Amino acid sequence: VLEEGKQVLYLLPEIALTTQIIHRLRTYFGNKVGVYHSRFSEFERVEIWQHVSDKTSDSYRVIIGARSALFLPFNNLGLIIVDEEHDMSYKQFEPSPHYQARDSAIVLAKLHEAKTLLGSATPAIETYNNTAREKYGLVSLYQRYGGVELPNIKIVDLRKENRKKQNYTLYSKPLLESITQALAKKEQIIL
């Protein structure tokens, strides 16, 4: 994307998470990396705003930021990365405007004819559903850090169980069976 002269927006759910990513990206991309978030002074935000909108500027081709970075005046956006896309911090409740940054990133990418990459070890249910419906592509990691075993994920349509008069709870029959088996083995459960 950068070789094509385009810009990259790297969204993080929390400002506190930017330090590690900034160091890694600046090591590789140097002064092409800029950071933008609401805790910057007005002067700092204006400076980044100007660099991002300037078609002749080679600095700040990669912008790392939280939700507010979506509103920068990108002049040639080629890729938006939404790291930890499942995180509730991407939802803006107060003050207005109310929005979901992940969904806004997808719309912004379409407006710029850019690509969107949603990253998460635990994707949001709607994202996982969109991959199952092949609306989104899915890249799976088959090995976890430290050799931890991958969980077995099964999607169950509760509406079908309700129609068959098999279940009227918020939990599917296979989930309840798995919980019972885990408890019988004295294992822990997290919902």
What is each stretch, according to the model?
Residues 23-63, 71-77:
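Conserved motor-coupling elements within RecA-like helicase/translocase cores
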Residues 2-25, 44:
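Conserved Walker A/P-loop ATP-binding site and its immediately adjacent core
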Residues 5-8, 32, 56-62, 76-79, ...:
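Loop/turn-to-beta-strand initiation segments
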Residues 103-190:
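Conserved interdomain linker/interface between the two RecA-like ATPase lobes of SF2 helicase motors
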Residues 66-117:
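SF2 helicase catalytic motif II
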Residues 20-24, 28, 48-51, 80, ...:
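Alpha-helical scaffold elements adjacent to nucleotide-binding pockets in ATP/GTP-utilizing enzyme cores
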Residues 33-42, 87-99, 159-168:
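Flexible beta-alpha connector loops of hexameric P-loop NTPases
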Residues 18-20, 43-46, 72-73, 88-91, ...:
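Switch/connector loops and helix/strand junctions flanking conserved nucleotide-binding motifs
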